[in-house]
Design a protein with these regions (language model features):
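Boundary at the C-terminal end of the N-terminal hydrophobic targeting segment
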Residues: 22-27
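Short glycine- and acidic-rich boundary segments immediately preceding or forming the N-terminal edge
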Residues: 29-32
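Positively charged n-region of N-terminal signal peptides that target proteins for export
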Residues: 1-5
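Short, solvent-exposed loop/turn segments at the edges of secondary structure
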Residues: 15, 52-54, 115, 140
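Bacterial N-terminal signal peptides
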Residues: 8-20
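Active-site HxH/HxHxD metal-binding segment of metal-dependent hydrolases
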Residues: 37, 84-149
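Conserved beta-strand hairpin/beta-sheet module of binuclear metal-dependent hydrolase folds
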Residues: 36-86
Length: 150
């Protein structure tokens, strides 16, 4: 084969292969992480919420719900899945939402809980870090505590 023929065929073949791979990649939708809630063995009111590889816990008390870490895979409205799972078990008010720390994967769903009436709590260091980050999508804690672990 001549060089001219090879180069003439190579460009369209390369383009066809590239378009084929691009179309295939675009056709594959991201897999939604599995959502599950399980009761902690030996308890009547403590639950673990799982959102893919993340988990949080909540406690249903006689006065309402205390939830932790609104894991939401980085979407400000992603906490709705967590709230929906709580609502499958109780219609009691969400009293408190506790951030374990300031990482976005653990706090991204805070707005949904705040809108549901929760008071948001965190350690004072987490609150200070969230204030410094100044992310408009982040719900800042209403209250912070200073606890020392010895």
């Amino acid at each position: 084969m001549s060089r001219h023929l090879i180069s003439t065929l190579a460009i369209p073949l390369f383009s066809l292969l590239t378009l084929s791979f691009a179309a295939q990649a675009q056709a594959q939708q991201p897999i939604r992480p599995p959502i599950a809630t399980t009761q902690v063995e030996g308890t009547d009111n403590v639950y673990i919420f799982r959102n893919g590889g993340h988990q949080a816990m909540f406690v249903v008390t006689s006065d309402g719900v205390i939830a932790t870490d609104p894991v939401a895979y980085g979407k400000p409205t992603g906490g709705q899945d967590y709230l929906n799972e709580i609502r499958k078990l109780t219609d009691k008010p969400i009293r408190y939402l506790v951030y374990s720390h300031h990482h976005f994967d653990h706090i991204a769903g805070g707005k949904v809980f705040k809108d549901a009436g929760a008071k948001v709590l965190a350690h004072r260091i987490a609150k200070a870090r969230l204030e410094r980050l100044n992310d408009p999508h982040t719900v800042l804690p209403d209250e912070a505590w200073a606890m020392r672990v010895v």
